[in-house]
Curated annotation (Swiss-Prot):
Name recorded for this polypeptide: Endoribonuclease YbeY
Top-level EC class: hydrolase
InterPro entries listed in its UniProt record: MetalPrtase_cat_dom_sf_prd (IPR023091), YbeY (IPR002036), YbeY_CS (IPR020549)
GO cellular component: cytoplasm
Residues holding Zn(2+): H109, H113, H119
Main localization of the protein described in the UniProt heading: cytoplasm
Transmembrane portions of the chain: none
Region (Disordered): 142-192
Amino acid sequence: MTVRLSSEHPRGRSAARRLRTRAAAYLAALGRADAEISILLVGDRRIRALNREWRGKDAATDVLSFPLSEPPGSGPLLGDVVISLDTAARRARQERRAVGAELDRYLAHGLLHLLGYDHERPADARRMARKEAELARAEGLVGAALREGGPARAAETETSWTRSPTSTSTRSPSGSTARGTRARSSRAGSGR
């Protein structure tokens, strides 16, 4: 398993170790110990530009995913996950949750997009939310949410992880993949 992590954000270094460890645990729990992914930590300005370019949405978002294989998740090179640290910090404050727990949620959501999960239809959204909740329970995030924000936060951690639809494109946002080459995917730009 290879998890490459880079940051364009001044606070990215503090989140890097946690996300690298969490990504490895999630991939193992998903039966994808063979996988290669890259994670890019950015601010709201950068993720807004990527969201506008790849999904036609001129707004900052929390996480974007760029699968590299067709169908998604079919090869060892899964793709890129881009996370906004600014959005994570803002939402964590709003929800009275630790920033690390918010980042864990975004990472799980992004990885599932790389594996072909989506939330285009209600049934797909429920399936994806169940898988996110399984990952949260497997990694003890529900317990962490109880410690960080009480029972309401734990319930939310388990159930409310779906957002907006996927779009398509032909390359990754950073021009790189888990191996550092330009991505070629017809399903780039999955986000919340």
